[in-house]
């Protein structure tokens, strides 16, 4: 019985380590792909958040590579409705807006709006602060959440291929 328990524990630990290793490699690959796609892009996340304000209150924003193409996506909230605003990363202007009506996107938007409902500082303001405090870095994502009942934004920054995440208080 004891040998079986040890074998199961070792197998579980091995599987867990393998999953974590795969996740780290996947995350590294995504970061490398994003860093490469951002080379030469003049539009900042802050400008994208500002542009999206015409469609509602920005509740999250990020650069991402989707189908091999760079995209600047901002979730906004207007009343009780949510939208995904795609900002053209070449011009800094809104390219298209789509309603968020279900699935994981709606779940994420609701959680983000809950965090943003308790803020005194805008997501753009928090992002600008993070960039100002981290010279030579640019923001690639800003995601709000509640920590111990207080709203914070996790701002992911990049300089070349170096990524780091900082927390900014929103209250």
Describe the predicted segments one by one:
Residues 2-9, 14-171:
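Long, terminal "pre-/pro-" and other extracytoplasmic accessory regions
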